[in-house]
Amino acid sequence: MLYFSTRNSNEKVTASQAISHGLAPDGGLYVPESLPQLTLEDIKALGKENYKERALKIMKPFLDEFTEPELKTMIARAYGDNFDSDSAAPVHFLDDNTAVLELSLIHI
């Protein structure tokens, strides 16, 4: 996937170039040239994954120049042991069509 500046859509860069630059040379933000399409089933399946697996599936289409093992390593290093469990942001299903994402700073 390629990225372009919010101030100039003509010059495109790779994800690693966008990450390395931070901001585009013209001061704009880098945005993806397209957004991956997810089906309802894709979205429901994300709720059944642990946080790191969910992060991988969400990031992978945006960072397609990196291999899956590279992405897994980056995710593991980014999140490390900073959370009480692998479910850093657990999803609780209330029924087949309703889920709640738990975001908590303190676990008692």
Language-model regions: role of each:
Residues 1-65:
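N-terminal, positively charged, Ser/Thr/Ala/Gly-biased leader segments
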Residues 106-108:
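Conserved small/polar residues in nucleotide/adenosyl-binding loops
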Residues 47-103:
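Glycine-rich, N-terminal phosphate-binding loop and its surrounding beta-alpha-beta segment
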